[in-house]
Design a protein with these regions (language model features):
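Short secondary-structure boundary/capping segments
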Residues: 123-126, 179-183, 200-205
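RNase H-like nuclease fold core
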Residues: 90-163, 168-175
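Core catalytic machinery and nucleic-acid-binding channels of phosphodiester-processing enzymes
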Residues: 27, 79-90, 97, 130, ...
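Acidic/histidine-rich catalytic cores and adjacent linkers
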Residues: 64, 92, 116-118, 139, ...
Length: 408
């Protein structure tokens, strides 16, 4: 072999993460066979870098590890490793293709709003309740998409599912009959309380509008009487309904009562939490009654954790009490409890779950998947939206699974 000279290659080796860039000047010799009948040519080979590459092989792993950080976009990663955003995307697509994880006996389903196009508005997220890892994300929650997806999963695997945790969206509840023959539906207790809190909040907002309309009427009367605009201070009722609605909406056990009075600029005197509570409850005769009825369900929800049989006995009396009341909000709430009675009772079942500090006993809940959905929304916001669902799916699953598998 005869040397045909040395070529200097400029190689990016982004191992420095302190703002500096490491450039390797690689001297590569080219050889030619001295046999005139052969004239075979070859370059020197280096394990550090492949042919035609301007980045070392180590950069691929560094780039992939950075893709697990949902706070970094492709542009941020490219800037960090002194390369182009197209290169880091090609590296990701080369090594990452996330497959669906096997179904476990407790899975959670929920939607996340992506709005990529008409066929991908609400994506369906499936999560392993025990580990918290996402099993898969499907580009739509519509039946024409989910039906072939679940039907293609082997029946033996689907039959192993015992609990399907979701909110009160009826298509999710129907999955049990359609696809999971041995499972029961579980309606997350958070969504039940959310429904009640939302109804109470709407009651307070409507009450606030009534007081605002009263104040506006007073202002108009003053204007018609004196012929000029007159500034009216915010009324006590509007002030309390705007600033202290949490006295009704928050669970009483979580309220922090302060004995030490503080100066209130609106009332122009010192007042503590008990004073605010007294004024707030006096705004409308229903407020105290609503709080007592709400707290009754809160206590029922707390004391029966891990005891679905006792919850099944107590919920009937609650339904009767709410439905026979004269308050429309709680009549509707009682009808809601009656409609989803069995799935709500199933939410009191407790199972062992893997957490950051090890295994612990937990109620069946959609709380973990709500946290997971937040990460998908953050990823979408950081990337200013996505057009390629498959890339978004791979990025999301790769970043949120504890031990993702690389391909290649």
């Amino acid at each position: 072999m005869h040397s045909r000279g040395i070529k200097t290659r400029t190689i990016n080796h982004p191992v420095l993460q302190d703002g500096y860039q490491l450039i390797i000047k690689l001297k590569q010799r080219r050889w030619r066979c001295t046999n005139t009948d052969c004239l075979y040519e070859s370059n020197e080979h280096f394990k550090l870098v492949n042919r035609y590459r301007r980045n070392t092989n180590a950069s691929d792993l560094l780039i992939l590890n950075q893709f697990r950080n949902l706070n970094c976009s492709a542009v941020d990663i490219a800037r960090q490793f002194h390369t182009s955003d197209m290169h880091v995307l090609n590296v990701f697509d080369k090594y990452i293709q996330m497959d669906r994880l096997p179904l476990t006996d407790a899975i959670s389903v929920d939607e996340v709003y992506l709005d990529m196009d008409k066929s991908c508005k609400y994506a369906l997220v499936i999560q392993d309740f025990y580990t918290g890892d996402p099993i898969d994300i499907i580009h739509s929650r519509l039946d024409r998409v989910t039906e072939p997806y679940f039907s293609n999963i082997p029946l033996k695997e689907r039959a192993s599912v015992k609990y399907l945790i979701s909110d009160m969206y009826n298509p999710y509840l129907s999955y049990v009959k359609k696809y999971f023959p041995n499972a029961v539906s579980v309606v997350d207790s958070f969504h039940v309380m959310q429904w009640l809190i939302h109804s109470l909040d709407m009651f307070l907002r409507n009450l606030q509008k009534e007081y605002k309309a009263r104040d506006e009427s007073t202002r108009c009367e003053i204007f018609s009487k004196y012929g000029h605009q007159h500034r009216i201070n915010v009324s006590d009722e509007v002030y309390l309904l705007k600033k202290y609605r949490w006295l009704l909406l928050k669970n009483q056990e979580h309220l922090e009562y302060r004995l030490e009075p503080r100066y209130d600029r609106h009332f122009r005197y010192f007042i503590n939490t008990f004073g605010y509570e007294e004024k707030f409850l006096a705004l409308h005769p229903y407020i105290k009654v609503f709080r007592d009825l709400k707290e009754e369900y809160v206590r029922f929800n707390s004391r029966n954790a891990g005891n679905p049989l006792k919850a099944s006995e107590e919920i009937d009396s609650l339904i009767h009490k709410y439905c026979s009341s004269e308050y429309h909000i709680f009549v509707q709430f009682g009808n809601l409890l009656r409609k989803y009675k069995n799935p709500i009772i199933n939410s009191f079942i407790m199972v062992d779950r893997l957490g950051p500090d090890g295994i612990y006993n937990s109620r069946l809940s959609n709380g973990p998947i709500e946290s997971l959905n937040r990460k998908a929304k953050d990823l979408k916001r950081l990337g200013r939206g996505f057009r390629n669902f498959e890339h978004m799916r791979n990025r999301f699953l790769f970043a949120t699974r504890k031990n993702p598998i690389y391909k290649g």
